[in-house]
Amino acid sequence: MIVSVKGEKEMNKLVFKQFEIGREYFLKIIEAVSKDQTDVQPDGFNNTIHWHTGHVLTITEQTMFGFPHATTHLPANYMELFGNGTKPADWTGNVPTMGELKIQLKDQLARIQQIPAEQLNNNLEKPFLGCKTFGELAGVTLMHEATHMGQIQAMKRIIEHVGVKN
């Protein structure tokens, strides 16, 4: 399939529009979570809504901006708090509040929207998660955020309607 340069640019703009729509919806969902619900870990779940929120922020920073090596927008300890394989039961030290995470999520979206659309065509230094280009990685990042959005929605419903283990 041959795509014109103009068509490619429009497709790239669409990716950034998806980030905007997805992030705004993510923020709307976490705004609807009460303070009492954010650190509850329902039966059958390894993490909390608080963790999922920080995880989305941290992994998006990692994939879109090279965190922790290429960006200093987030504290370095976010990898220990919210990186893959982490859990709230292991948290020690300074853990950001949900309010802080919400501000950082909004800031991150603004920075994502500043990425030049043509950058999505750039090849990655080495394939990551099956992705060869930055645009492919952006697509996986969008899917990742949507997956965790679903987890948060499920957890909220369970917390509201069923027993919890905390």
Protein language model annotation of sequence segments:
Residues 16-20, 27, 37-84, 126-166:
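Short, contiguous alpha-helical
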